[in-house]
């Protein structure tokens, strides 16, 4: 059986491709760099900035309540999408440091058990991809069908344009072309903004599991220096914590890698995740209110059903892997006592106890310094949406 090649960076390829199309990967472009910078400026001015603006100007100025609600939900989503994209673009070079730390951790992977753990990552991230495809496809389909089955000339999303698109066929096609191209651009932004945190948190979980395995093997091989192995694992752990944001030496080294990696990732995804939690609660509430009280057209109802389901599913993978991170970080001190520590010298035991004290500190990714990226926050977001919905019910009474 062929040996699994460990390369965590392969899971970043689709994100770098997306960032390149979005115009934020200029430092990775070697040819036609000036042209790429021009493309980046124009595309982000026309879409990242102007797309939410052309939706926002039309807020509560539309012909029907259904159009007002569609306009509001799309405006909130696109605004959040643009802000998240700009935050990621501002900190994009941090991804290079994450990749450097991941390479160091990949080099530490040895043995069939650790490679088997890495092999499971492909399955998990493929399932994440299926979740996002399942989110986007029905919403896009019913948004398009709702647009096509309109009885009179209209836009895909209610919005403002500086020209008369209603009475001019040419302007009508220009407006719709802009909306279709713009929403495709924003969907790509949304994919990379929502998928990247899930991917990096999944990678952290897998590397923590592999570190756990390396801890258990410390001191079992008499031919290896147990103290150096332990130090290497501790260094790996520190690198992982920073990124999110012989045997003893290697274990300590791994511990340090984990610490650095985790802190780096947490800093990178913190504000975008806070924005996503807030917008999810708001849009789930609006979508439910639209279904119950306002929208009667069949296609529009189907759109809001899938939209209300899609919003929480966008944050679920990140919350799931954030919970998995916390669980495995919390078990590392058990792994330390699972190794062959009782036969080692005093220096080994001193370093191991130092590691145990460090690993007892809770390591949880936090969004905006306030909300844990955790399943508890996922359910709290749904509760927040329900609370807003009950306020709407009381206001109607």
Swiss-Prot record:
UniProtKB keywords: Cell membrane, Glycoprotein, Membrane, Olfaction, Receptor, Sensory transduction, Transducer, Transmembrane, Transmembrane helix
Compartmental location: Cell membrane
Keyword Transmembrane helix: yes
Parts of the chain on the Extracellular side: 58-68, 150-179, 296-301, 394-397
Glycosylation sites: 62
Top-level taxon of the source organism: Eukaryota
GO cellular component, one term: plasma membrane
Coiled coil regions in record: none
Gene Ontology terms for molecular function: ionotropic olfactory receptor activity; odorant binding; olfactory receptor activity
Residues passing through the membrane, by range: 37-57, 69-92, 129-149, 180-200, 275-295, 302-322, 373-393
Cytoplasmic side: 1-36, 93-128, 201-274, 323-372
Listed Pfam families: 7tm_6
Membrane topology: Multi-pass membrane protein
Organs and tissues of expression: Expressed in neurons of the third antennal segment.
One GO BP annotation of this record: signal transduction
Misc. comment: The atypical heteromeric and topological design of the odorant receptors appears to be an insect-specific solution for odor recognition, making the OR/Orco complex an attractive target for the development of highly selective insect repellents to disrupt olfactory-mediated host-seeking behaviors of insect disease vectors. Odor-evoked OR currents are independent of known G-protein-coupled second messenger pathways.
Protein role: Odorant receptor which mediates acceptance or avoidance behavior, depending on its substrates. The odorant receptor repertoire encodes a large collection of odor stimuli that vary widely in identity, intensity, and duration. May form a complex with Orco to form odorant-sensing units, providing sensitive and prolonged odorant signaling and calcium permeability. Involved in the behavioral responses to ethyl acetate, anisole, hexanoic acid, and pyrazines.
Assembly notes: Interacts with Orco. Complexes exist early in the endomembrane system in olfactory sensory neurons (OSNs), coupling these complexes to the conserved ciliary trafficking pathway.
Family affiliation: Belongs to the insect chemoreceptor superfamily. Heteromeric odorant receptor channel (TC 1.A.69) family. Or2a subfamily.
Protein name: Odorant receptor 59a
Lineage of source species: Eukaryota, Metazoa, Ecdysozoa, Arthropoda, Hexapoda
């Amino acid at each position: 059986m062929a040996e699994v090649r460990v390369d965590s960076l392969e899971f970043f390829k689709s994100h770098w491709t997306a960032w390149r199309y979005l115009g934020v990967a200029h430092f990775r472009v070697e040819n036609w760099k000036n042209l790429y910078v021009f493309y980046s400026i124009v595309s982000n001015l026309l879409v990242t900035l102007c797309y939410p603006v052309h939706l926002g100007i039309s807020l509560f100025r539309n012909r029907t309540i259904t159009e007002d609600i569609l306009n509001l939900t799309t405006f909130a989503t696109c605004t959040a999408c643009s802000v998240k994209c700009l935050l990621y673009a501002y900190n994009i070079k941090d991804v290079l440091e994450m990749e450097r730390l991941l390479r160091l951790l990949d080099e530490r992977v040895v043995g069939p058990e650790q490679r088997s753990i890495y092999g499971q990552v492909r399955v998990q991230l493929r399932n994440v991809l299926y979740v996002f495809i399942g989110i986007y496809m029905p919403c896009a389909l019913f948004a398009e069908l709702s647009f096509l089955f309109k009885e009179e000339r209209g836009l895909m999303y209610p919005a403002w344009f500086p020209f008369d698109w209603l009475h001019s066929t040419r302007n009508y096609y220009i407006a719709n072309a802009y909306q279709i191209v713009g929403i495709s651009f924003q969907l790509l932004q949304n994919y990379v903004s929502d998928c990247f945190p899930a991917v990096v948190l999944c990678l952290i979980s897998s590397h923590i599991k592999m570190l756990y395995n390396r801890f258990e093997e410390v001191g079992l091989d008499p031919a290896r220096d147990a103290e150096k192995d332990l130090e290497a694992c501790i260094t790996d752990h520190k690198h992982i914590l920073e990124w999110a944001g012989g045997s003893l030496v290697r274990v300590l080294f791994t511990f340090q890698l984990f610490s650095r990696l985790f802190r780096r990732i947490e800093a990178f995804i913190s504000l975008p995740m806070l924005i996503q939690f807030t917008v999810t609660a708001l849009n789930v509430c609006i979508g439910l209110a639209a279904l119950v009280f306002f929208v009667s057209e069949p296609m529009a109802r189907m759109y809001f059903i899938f939209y209300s389901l899609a919003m929480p599913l966008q944050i679920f993978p990140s919350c799931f892997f954030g919970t998995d991170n916390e669980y495995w970080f919390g078990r590392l001190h058990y792994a330390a006592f699972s190794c062959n520590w009782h036969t080692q010298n005093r220096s080994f035991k001193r370093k191991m106890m130092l590691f145990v004290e460090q690993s007892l500190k809770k390591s949880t990714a936090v969004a905006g310094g306030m909300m844990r990226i955790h399943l508890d926050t996922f359910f709290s977001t749904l509760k927040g949406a329900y609370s807003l919905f009950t306020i709407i019910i009381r206001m109607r009474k």
